[in-house]
């Protein structure tokens, strides 16, 4: 069993359901301390984080990731217990195998191999690890970034170990992500009897034309790196459960996934202008989960592409598709950010798994990126 596979198994065996760490970070920091990293453990509320650095000065290449996992669901539906790492037909099964304990193991073993070859490397290597990525993400990476900024430390390049690949490891690199802007809209009407609509105001009827306009709106056209901004309603709640009562209010939850062609403020203003056009009486609450970011061609992209060609035999696609990641907290500091990890086909699913051979490929790829930037 390779060092990367062994460490991945050790991490999977710890049931670190968000925001629990369950001892995963202790495993990692023990290994990193042994090769000269200075470790700073950072606990914010119920969340464990750590920042580890090797090297005294110069640009920082940071490995970022999370030890927490999503709940396993019904264990009886798994082909093997979700926290007992099991290898079957070349696949490693277990919760977190792909998202993202396999990546964490590859990061650590890549650094061990790199430091053994280059004990006096240039620049600095860092780890920013949290147990609060799969949950509300309020006391994890975002807090560590604030802590780093307060003491004037800036990450130059950042590799986030999210499972970016689709068919084979290294076939896709995420070099950006769309922004995410959520909203809860409560439209007020007047409750009444369905037989006497003239004595009531039906908020469903009132808001329906506005929602149709919002859904039909062309928010932007996207660009070479991002698709057009999308608007999606995820929840619509109204009514008392009775069939003869017009509801007094309707609550709608919707989300924008937006490109760099739009800003959160612009989307808010345009949304509220459409609502105003329809004369609605409403309350509105916005939540910005993250701004869009893009890492263009440069040192980090070049290093990653070179490494993937050499270690995976793939020609990677640069993509900004998919959901958000903790890269959204790191990119605004000015860092170049990429997401590079294993195949994402089974993440958050029953029988989550990762190809065993891909773990060593990923470790070798991370090691090659270290060589390209810091050797």
Swiss-Prot record:
The keyword Disulfide bond does not apply. One of its GO terms (biological process) is L-arginine biosynthetic process. The active site is at residues 68, 133. It catalyses: N-succinyl-(2S,6S)-2,6-diaminopimelate + H2O = (2S,6S)-2,6-diaminopimelate + succinate. Its EC number is 3.5.1.18. It comes from the Bacteria. Keywords: Amino-acid biosynthesis, Cobalt, Diaminopimelate biosynthesis, Hydrolase, Lysine biosynthesis, Metal-binding, Zinc. One of its GO terms (molecular function) is acetylornithine deacetylase activity. Zn(2+) 2 binds at residues 99, 134, 348. Pathway: Amino-acid biosynthesis; L-lysine biosynthesis via DAP pathway; LL-2,6-diaminopimelate from (S)-tetrahydrodipicolinate (succinylase route): step 3/3. Gene3D superfamilies: Zn peptidases (3.40.630.10). CDD domains: M20_DapE_proteobac (cd03891). Binds 2 Zn(2+) or Co(2+) ions per subunit. Homodimer. Belongs to the peptidase M20A family. DapE subfamily. Catalyzes the hydrolysis of N-succinyl-L,L-diaminopimelic acid (SDAP), forming succinate and LL-2,6-diaminopimelate (DAP), an intermediate involved in the bacterial biosynthesis of lysine and meso-diaminopimelic acid, an essential component of bacterial cell walls. This is Succinyl-diaminopimelate desuccinylase. It comes from Teredinibacter turnerae (strain ATCC 39867 / T7901).
């Amino acid at each position: 069993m390779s060092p990367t596979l062994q460490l991945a198994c050790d991490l999977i065996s710890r049931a670190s359901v968000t925001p629990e760490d369950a001892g995963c970070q202790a495993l990692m920091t023990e290994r990193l301390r042994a090769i000269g990293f200075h470790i700073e453990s950072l606990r914010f509320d119920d969340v464990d984080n750590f920042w580890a650095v090797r090297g005294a000065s110069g640009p920082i290449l940071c490995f970022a990731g999370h030890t927490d996992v999503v709940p396993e669901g019904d264990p009886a539906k798994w082909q093997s217990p979700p926290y007992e790492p099991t290898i079957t037909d070349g696949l490693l099964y277990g919760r977190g195998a792909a998202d993202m304990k396999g990546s964490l193991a590859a990061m650590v073993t890549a650094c061990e191999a790199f430091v053994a070859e280059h004990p006096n490397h240039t620049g600095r290597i860092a780890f920013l690890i949290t147990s609060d990525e799969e949950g509300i993400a309020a006391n994890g990476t975002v807090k560590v970034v604030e802590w780093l900024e307060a003491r004037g430390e800036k990450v130059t390049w950042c590799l986030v170990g999210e499972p970016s690949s689709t068919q084979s490891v290294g076939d896709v690199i995420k070099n950006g992500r769309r922004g995410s802007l959520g909203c809860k809209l409560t439209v007020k009407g007047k409750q009444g009897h369905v037989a006497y609509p003239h004595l009531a105001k039906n908020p469903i009827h009132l808001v329906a034309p506005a929602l149709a306009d919002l859904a039909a709106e062309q928010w932007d056209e996207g660009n070479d790196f991002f698709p057009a901004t999308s608007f999606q309603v995820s929840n619509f709640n109204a009514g008392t459960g009775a069939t003869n009562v017009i509801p007094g209010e309707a609550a709608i939850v919707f989300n924008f996934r937006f490109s760099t062609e739009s800003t959160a403020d612009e989307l808010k203003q345009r949304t509220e202008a459409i609502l105003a056009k329809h004369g609605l009486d409403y309350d509105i609450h916005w939540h910005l989960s993250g701004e869009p970011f893009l890492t263009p061609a440069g040192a980090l992209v070049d290093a990653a592409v070179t490494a993937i060609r050499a270690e995976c035999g793939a020609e990677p696609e640069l993509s900004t598709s998919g959901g958000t990641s903790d890269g959204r907290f790191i990119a605004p500091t000015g860092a170049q950010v990429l997401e590079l990890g294993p195949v994402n086909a089974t993440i958050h699913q029953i029988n989550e798994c990762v190809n065993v051979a891909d773990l060593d490929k990923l470790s070798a790829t991370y090691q090659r990126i270290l060589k390209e930037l810091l050797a």
